[in-house]
Amino acid sequence: MTGLEHGPLMRRALELAERGGGRTAPNPMVGCVLVTSDGTVIGEGYHRQAGGPHAEVVALEAARAGGHDPAGATAVVTLEPCDAHNRTPPCTVALLEAGVAEVVYALSDPHIGKGGAERLRAGGVLVTGGVLEAEARRLLEPWLHFVTTGRPHFHVKTAQTLNGRVTRGREGEPWITGPEARRLVHRLRRRSAAVMVGSGTVLADDPLLTVRDWPPQEEAEEWPEVQPVRVVLDTRLRTPLDARLVVTAGVLPLWILAGEDAPAERERELAGRGAEVIRVATGRTGLDLAAVADELARREITGLLVEAGPTLATALLEAGLVDRWTMLLAPDWVTRKGALPVLLTDAPYVGFELVEPEWSIHGPDAAVTGQVRRAG
């Protein structure tokens, strides 16, 4: 195969990889396409969940199940095949035993000594790396951050008006953004190991924090149903017992991170309804966010979407814990008293910039996302 032919196949592998979002942590999302020398796709697969078979193995099994011999085929995979025996055997062994002739991958394994490119080459396999590397790096950004820093990747999402208001200042007002932009939020939830809000958002909006509007209806049968862990930062355990998050805690995971001195009786009441209350240290104004990050890392949450109100967004930004920010922008201008700004801070200056921003249009709304770099 020529390098020009690898791009579309790698793009398909990336599409497959995303289907595993929300279930693979602490492993990455990985997709694989097996193709013959004449360009016929004989097998596809993706890593569905931690502890399960890796994408390459799934694709090999799919090829054999379809009556195809993978010997001599090319494996197009989003991440360099692993050469380490952890929860599953090395993918290099499966590929070599299958007689695959060529392996094309997007991104090198960041774990020193665990990538399998050299072993594959030693076994006579033609290996090419770096195909659509930027796209793969973008998809795997939370996982890469986790394995290189040991801390979960915090992706903050806000919805705001043109003048930076996240509420309209009056109860019962409609959503800031329309259904197309909200569908993007559901896609981001679907990719994430966890979704986080503060107690203020729970009290104001009574969110459910589930994935409902993704994938598209016509693709629904091809995607496994996935719901992220729902996380609430609630120093004093103010979350109501009849909140939708609590009512559904028996069937969907809910972690409530509370201060060490939060009421024990309230913890028992919440636990009785299925929520898990996790005690963490407190700081000057609430939970110690570094301790929160450490606890989530201990629980192998590689990345989370933070649907932040002004208080939580400000606290995370000031703590240096915002890695990516997605802003949904509605074509409205709201000056009503009580309409809250994106950030609430007494600091004389809080600035940041979005690195390599990506803009998109969703119905009447716009979205911009980028990695966060503190300015000033």
Language-model regions, residue ranges each:
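Enzymes that bind and transform nitrogen-containing heteroaromatic metabolites
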Residues: T2-P28, G43-E44, H153-H155, Q160-G376
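Short capping loops/turns at secondary-structure boundaries
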Residues: A84, T88, G129-L132, V147-R151, ...
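Active-site beta-strand termini and strand-to-loop segments that position acidic
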Residues: T36-S37, T148-T149, Q371-R373
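Proteins enriched for Cys/Gly/acidic motifs involved in redox and nucleic-acid/cofactor modification
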Residues: R23-P26, G51-G52, A117, L126, ...
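Zn2+-dependent cytidine deaminase-like catalytic core
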Residues: L34-E135, W255
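Helix-turn-helix
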Residues: G31
